[in-house]
């Protein structure tokens, strides 16, 4: 998929004897779509592939934009114009979508420098917050140097900055904890200026009010 064959998976550590090719992946897996609302669709690999994650498709008035990318490449999915990343851990099969659909890949400059991103081609490496087709991008650092979250109208895209399990919320442990916490505080100040209804995470979609209550509890626990 990315032009070279590492000795082991950088995420789970599996040896390359257990790898499958991009062609085998496309033959045995597909991308399924689940509606979040009339403008946003959740994208997942089916059956779940490896450390499975969700990407999201946004239908703006101007273009079709993805937030992050599925691990499976499919020629059956509708064309996207851009794929904008929260961070470099969720590049998925984006280079194949870029080649087949001529999709433009956008990522923060700092994450484009990371080892996992070195074999990918990016069309725009942004450094500042921006607003494109009503999609607002906010760089907060933290979990990764270039971590960026997105807001489209009343939908908030957070990826895996925090996880939710057994009713509790936790910060992503992979990354500098102090910077992750500082990024969360910056994010909280931004969120408090928006009216939001849904949160789209790497493996969940939640009502914003429920998610925010857990997020507030997490931030408050830092003060104890």
Which stretches of residues belong to each language-model region?
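Short, flexible loop segments at the rims of nucleotide/cofactor-binding pockets, characterized by
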Residues: 42-48, 63-68, 82-85, 134-140, ...
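Active-site HxH/HxHxD metal-binding segment of metal-dependent hydrolases
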Residues: 52, 70-133, 217-220
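Metallo-beta-lactamase
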Residues: 1-8, 15-18, 64-65, 103, ...
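Short acidic/polar capping segments at secondary-structure boundaries
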Residues: 48, 71-72, 89-90, 110-112, ...
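Short, solvent-exposed secondary-structure boundary motifs
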Residues: 39-51, 112, 116, 129, ...
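Conserved beta-strand hairpin/beta-sheet module of binuclear metal-dependent hydrolase folds
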Residues: 28-73, 148-164
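N-terminal juxtadomain amphipathic helix
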Residues: 1-46
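Structural signal for conserved beta-strand scaffold positions within catalytic alpha/beta enzyme cores
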Residues: 42, 85, 107, 121-125, ...
């Amino acid at each position: 998929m990315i032009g070279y064959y590492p000795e082991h998976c950088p995420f789970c550590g599996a040896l390359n004897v257990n790898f499958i090719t991009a062609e085998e992946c496309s033959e045995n897996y597909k991308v399924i779509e689940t509606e979040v609302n009339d403008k946003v669709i959740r994208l997942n690999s089916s059956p779940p592939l490896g450390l499975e994650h969700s990407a999201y498709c946004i239908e703006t008035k101007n273009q079709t934009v993805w937030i992050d990318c599925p691990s499976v490449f499919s020629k059956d999915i509708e064309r996207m114009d851009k794929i904008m990343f929260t961070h470099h851990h969720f590049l998925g099969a984006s280079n194949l979508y870029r080649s087949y659909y001529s999709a433009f890949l956008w990522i923060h400059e700092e994450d484009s420098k990371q080892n996992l991103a070195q074999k990918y081609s990016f069309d725009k490496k942004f450094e500042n917050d921006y607003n494109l087709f009503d999609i607002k991008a906010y760089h907060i650092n933290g979990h990764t140097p270039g971590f960026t979250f997105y807001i489209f109208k009343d939908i908030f895209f957070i990826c895996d900055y925090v996880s939710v399990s057994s009713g509790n919320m936790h910060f992503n442990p992979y990354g500098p904890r102090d910077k992750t916490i500082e990024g969360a505080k910056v994010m909280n100040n931004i969120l408090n200026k928006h009216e939001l209804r849904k949160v789209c995470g790497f493996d969940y979609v939640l009502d914003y009010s429920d998610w925010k209550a857990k997020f507030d509890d997490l931030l408050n626990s830092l003060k104890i």
